[in-house]
Amino acid sequence: MVVVGKIHEMKDIVKKLKKEGKTIGFVPTMGYLHEGHLSLVRKSKSQNDITIMSIFVNPIQFGPNEDYDRYPRDFERDKNLAEKEGVDYVFYPSVKEMYPDDFKTVVSVKKITDIMCGKSRPGHFDGVATVVLKLFNIVNPDRAYFGQKDAQQLAVIKQMVKDLNLDVEIVPCPIVREEDGLAMSSRNTYLSGDERKSATVLYRALNLAKDLIEKGERNVSKLKKAMEDLILKEKYTKIDYIEFVNYDTFEPISKVEGKVLIALAVFVGTTRLIDNIVVEV
């Protein structure tokens, strides 16, 4: 496995691989790898000749009072995990390398960023879209792999790829969960023991909504209320949002029909966690 820190070096490597007719799968990450990330690597390896992973904690997708400085980082650990999974190249640039002093461009996907995490974290998805477009231009992948856990991020990236005619196939991958249902996340490391127990309520609330829908409930405000009641029974919880949106358009809905994404963000202590499920009626 080769670690590459410079953009021009990564681009040269990619040019050579493309000349040899190799297909490239790309797994963009912010590091502190967990089983969710590794499942993306396995998927990439099964579909491409070469797998490139980026590890870059992207400062421009964090708000002023968010956790950029304390976001967990352990490059040695990540490198070992990536190597063990058979990643071919790790692109590990510095902030200066990605954003030199004269950097002036922002990529902004409208409308689908007005709700959910886009509303709670203004500017977040501009930061995501900008870094992902930059990474796509550096790595020039045939396919790129994203977890369904960040459902809104996935929608934003799909929209950007479509609108800007990018030659990359976006491959969504299922959420990987702990045994008790908690969606795997690098931010789970922030939770205390008691908070960790409370955190299972996100998935329980999503499943409660799913069960109620299966029993015939279609009214979104009633479903939200049931989820809120369950979540707020737990200690340490504060709801950021619960949203029901059409899976394809990302439009908020008031009645459950067709394919629906149910997504939520909940603070457990000071840690903001997200999760979602898809239901079809």
UniProtKB/Swiss-Prot annotation:
Q: Which keywords accompany this UniProt record?
A: ATP-binding, Cytoplasm, Ligase, Nucleotide-binding, Pantothenate biosynthesis
Asked if the keyword Repeat belongs to this entry, the reply reads: no
| Reaction(s) the record says it catalyses | (R)-pantoate + beta-alanine + ATP = (R)-pantothenate + AMP + diphosphate + H(+)
Q: In which pathway does it act?
A: Cofactor biosynthesis; (R)-pantothenate biosynthesis; (R)-pantothenate from (R)-pantoate and beta-alanine: step 1/1
Q: Which Pfam families would you find in this protein's record? A: Pantoate_ligase
Under Enzyme Commission nomenclature, its number is 6.3.2.1
Binding-site positions, beta-alanine: Q61
Residues where (R)-pantoate binds: Q61, Q153
Q: Which positions bind ATP?
A: 30-37, 147-150, 176, 184-187
Q: Name one GO cellular component term.
A: cytosol
Q: Where in the cell is it found?
A: Cytoplasm
Q: What class of enzyme is it?
A: ligase
- Give the top-rank taxon of the lineage listed in the UniProt record for this protein: Bacteria
MF terms (GO), sorted A to Z: ATP binding; pantoate-beta-alanine ligase activity
Active site residues per record: H37 (proton donor)
* BP term (GO), one: pantothenate biosynthetic process
Q: Which NCBIfam families match?
A: cyt_tran_rel, panC
What the protein does comes down to: Catalyzes the condensation of pantoate with beta-alanine in an ATP-dependent reaction via a pantoyl-adenylate intermediate.
Spell out the note in the miscellaneous section.
The reaction proceeds by a bi uni uni bi ping pong mechanism.
According to the record's subunit comment, the protein's assembly and interactions are: Homodimer.
Q: Family, per the entry? A: Belongs to the pantothenate synthetase family.
Under which name does UniProt file this protein? Pantothenate synthetase
Query: Taxonomic lineage of this organism?
Result: Bacteria, Bacillati, Bacillota, Bacillota incertae sedis, Caldicellulosiruptorales
